[in-house]
Design a protein with these regions (language model features):
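Membrane translocator/pore-forming domains, dominated by Gram-negative outer-membrane beta-barrels
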Residues: 1-218
């Protein structure tokens, strides 16, 4: 089998700072396009090639609270104990594969949440001509997954909807360790370019991801 998944996300950031305490909220909305080509055979009947495609949406909310423990007199570097929580919902439309052994695929919705506890090390790296400093950070946290922990779908041979059955993917571990690093480089007076890399380690599922983008502060 061979497949492609294209995802498009938009994030809205909110941050409130009160003394050493900071509260961060991120609202996320996304759109997904997926396609799958697979080959299957029946003994004595040869091989068949099937194709399917679908789309869907996802949305979620994330909250994180931190407290600054400054590491120098200028308050330019800090160790931040942190706690966070999130909830996400995703939905993919049902579809019917084309091909000799095509299947109806449906019921792929999922809802899950996370709670995390960890720490972040942040510090200024350099300043640009506007006096704004580049920021770097390292972070580690333990995360507990709640809700749906595997991918599931209802399958039925095309044209025989009453013969459906549920298929469950691998069930990943509920507790994981996440590590990451990031850098933010100021651009002008209100903009900045950021880059992040992250890794998640848990039983039966390890993942790595990176992102780069532009953030406007106002």
């Amino acid at each position: 089998a061979n497949g492609d998944l294209d995802s498009y996300y938009g994030n809205l950031f909110f941050r409130i700072q009160s003394g050493r305490w900071a509260h961060n909220i991120i609202l996320t909305c996304g759109w997904n396009d997926a396609s799958l080509d697979r080959t299957a055979g029946i003994p004595g009947a040869g091989m068949y090639t099937m194709h399917g495609s679908t789309s869907g949406s996802s949305y979620g909310a994330f909250y994180e609270g931190t407290y600054d423990l400054y590491l120098n007199e200028n308050n330019t570097s800090a160790l931040q104990p942190l706690v966070n929580a999130s909830v996400y919902r995703s939905r993919m439309d049902g579809f019917t594969e084309s091909g000799g052994l095509g299947m109806n695929v449906d019921d792929m919705d999922s809802t899950f949440g996370t709670v995390g506890l960890g720490a972040r090390l942040r510090g200024e790296l350099s300043a640009n001509l506007t006096g704004r400093a580049s920021l770097g950070e390292l972070r580690v946290q333990v995360v507990q997954l709640l809700g749906d922990r595997d991918t599931a779908a209802v399958l039925a041979p095309a044209g025989i909807p009453g013969a459906g059955f549920r298929v469950n993917g691998a069930r990943e571990g509920a507790t994981g360790v996440q590590v990451g690093a990031g850098i933010t480089i100021p651009v002008g007076y209100t903009g900045s370019v950021f880059a992040d890399v992250n890794a998640d380690f848990r039983s039966r599922a390890n993942s790595f991801n990176g992102s780069i983008g532009y953030r406007l502060t106002f």
